[in-house]
From Swiss-Prot:
Protein name in UniProt: UPF0149 protein PM1723
InterPro entries with a match to the protein in the record: YgfB-like, YgfB-like_sf
Stated family: Belongs to the UPF0149 family.
Top-level taxonomic group: Bacteria
GO cellular component, one term: cytosol
Cited NCBIfam families: PRK01736.1, ygfB_yecA
Naturally occurring in which organism (per UniProt): Pasteurella multocida (strain Pm70)
Length: 182
């Protein structure tokens, strides 16, 4: 997989007005919502590129990213799914903006995969509400960067946990196989 900045540049070069964080959030939302077949591609084109296909090389890269996300989310025991945010940890404001964008596009993807998302109750409903709040994350540039950085890392970890929770919740349930009696 490309680096965050290289991939963001690939998107920009292709005329796609998304950051790597936004695209990663969108794909993660679709996957967490239960879309595992190729139906993610038309949704990607429709909602990120005015219904136009991506250039072949870029689509191959996006497909690898989609497969990587699926693999990481499916490995619940490993719990090593990560949000794809800018690597530059010195610029906490850029990372905070990217988290907000990731979360916003995650909810878009999740909502497309689960159209009745607003009807969810209990823990899942609370998780959705929390994600909506995180989309509107605000800060003041005069805030203490160290405190903001620590808070941001906690929020990133919380969003990561919620993504895994939602992935588990919305996965199609396979019918329980009963043992065959002879």
């Amino acid at each position: 997989m490309s680096s965050y900045s290289d991939f963001s540049q690939q998107l920009k070069t292709a005329g796609i007005a998304l950051s790597a964080a936004e695209l990663h959030g969108f794909l993660t939302g679709l996957i967490c919502g239960g879309i595992h077949d190729q139906s993610w591609q038309p949704l990607l084109f429709q909602f990120t590129n005015e219904n136009h296909a991506y250039p072949t090389a870029l689509l191959q890269e996006v497909t690898q990213i989609q497969q990587h996300i699926s693999k990481k989310l499916a490995d619940i025991d490993g719990f090593d799914f990560e949000l794809w945010l800018p690597e530059n940890e010195d610029d906490v404001f850029t990372r905070a903006d990217a988290l907000s964008e990731w979360t916003n596009h995650f909810l878009l993807g999740l909502g497309l995969a689960q159209p009745k998302l607003d009807k969810e109750k209990g823990d899942i409903g609370e998780a959705i509400d929390d994600l909506h709040d995180i989309c509107q994350l605000g800060y003041d540039e005069s805030d203490d960067k160290e405190e903001l950085s620590e808070a941001l890392e906690e929020i990133i970890e919380y969003v990561r946990t919620l993504a895994c929770l939602l992935f588990t919740h919305f996965q199609p349930q396979l019918p329980e196989q009963k043992p065959v009696l002879h």
